[in-house]
Amino acid sequence: MTRKISKREFMATSAAFTSSLLLSNGAVASTKYEILMLNKDPNNSKNKMIFSPHLLKVQVGDEVSFIPTDKGHNSEIIKGMLPAGAEKWRGKINKQVDVVFDTPGFYGYQCKPHANMGMIGLIVVEGDSMLDNLEEARSVKHRGKAKKAWQALWDEADAAGLTG
C-alpha cells in the first residue's frame, strides 16, 4: 500500500534534505582537481618546468591538489595574486598540497625554485566578486621567463573569457 503525501509534506521534506546537504559541508557539491608539477610537458618536450594544467577555472568550494609528479617542485601563491580574505598556501618541495578555494577571484601561483623559468599557473574561482582582484593580480611584476609566461597566460585567460 502506498501513502500519498501532501504538497506541504513534500516541500518540507525537500527543504530539510536540501538544508542537510548545505549544512553538511557548506556546499551541495564540490569538485576535486589535480594539477601536475612536471619537468617537461608530455605533449611538447620543448616546454620545461610546467604545471599541467597551468590555467584552471573552478567554483567556490572546489579543491585542487598540486601533485609533485616530478621531483624538485612545490606550489605557492604569488604575493599580490590572491583575492582579499583568501587563504595563502606554500607547499613544501616534493610534497602534495591540497587547497580548497572559498573566495572568488584570481590566484596566481608558482614553483618557487623554477618561477624564473616560467613555472607558473593561474586558478580562476568563479563567483560574484571574482573580478575584484583582477587588476591587482595583472599588475604584479615578474622576472625572467615568468614575465613572458604570465603575458601568455593572461592572453589565454582573456581568450577563454575568464577575465570579464
Model-derived features: positions:
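Extracytoplasmic copper-binding redox domains, predominantly the cupredoxin/blue-copper superfamily
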Residues: 2-6, 11-164
